[in-house]
Amino acid sequence: DAPVERLRTATREAFEGLVNLAIDEAVDFMVIAGDIYDGDCRDFNTGLFFVRQMGRLRQAGIPVYLLYGNHDAESEITKSLELPENVHVFSARKATSFRLDAHRVVLHGQSFRVAATEDNLLPGYPAPLPGWFNIGVLHTALEGNAAHARYAPCSPGELQAKGYQYWALGHVHEPRVERGDVTIAWPGNLQGRHIRECGPRGALLVSVEEDRVTDLARLETDVLRWQLLTVDVSGAANRSPVIRQVGQALGKLLDETPAHLPLAVRVVLVGHCAAHREMRGFE
């Protein structure tokens, strides 16, 4: 495919890949912690695509527990599409719970009613259900994360004090996991969208026994990967060694990347060298 077309379809391809993995792994259920849609996007083909993918999970007998985040709350698509019966949406009016009796798992969550939800939603979440594995689903960057808007702010200590065993968080695009008595996890987004979202992207496959997380496996779903490659060219006398060093660095990056995965790379040259003036006009 042409690079521009591949970029345009990458996010959908990544989501379809996630559904494929869920079916192949025969997961018991899927959790989506918000931002299916991109704000005020009005492309209903995106919504229809999402419904089709949820239908594939329904056919495989996989329930989905979906929480709407800030972008979903402002999306017209969210209000207009009818989802398959296997998709259970957390209410925006108050925190609600869904039980999976066969697995003794209960999920607690609250969707965003409006995009700019700046109140701490956590006090409204119910107490943990004794003897069950309690999962909290929340769309938040937590407090003190300057890189993200202050939506549904709360602290890690508040999450831990709630008494749930696992927190499935959305909003933050970078993957991050904190393990301990309570597991707090952002899987990040499924597909990097631009150069500020570099490296592998994907989801988390969580394994649980009784009341504890036994394994967290990273599932890579990106179909095109962004990378920022910094090359130190200090001391280069002319552009020839610069080109050679960049080529070597790119070769190493390609060796470390799955063969099927296209790369979009920004190369940054650092260091003082005599080749600086020559390189300024080089393309």
Question: Where are the model-predicted features located?
Answer:
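Short amphipathic alpha-helices and their capping/turn segments at secondary-structure boundaries
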Residues: A14-E25, R99, L122-A127, L254-T257
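His/Asp/Glu-rich metal-coordinating catalytic cores
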Residues: F29, D40-D215
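A short, flexible beta-alpha/helix-coil linker loop
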Residues: D35-G39, A141-E143, H272-A274
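N-terminal active-site segment of His-dependent metallophosphoesterases
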Residues: D1-L48
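Conserved residues at the C-terminal ends of beta-strands
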Residues: A33, G170, V270
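Accessory, non-catalytic peripheral segments of nucleic-acid enzymes
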Residues: L219-E283
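Domain-start "cap" segments at the beginnings of catalytic or binding domains
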Residues: D1-P3, S207-D232
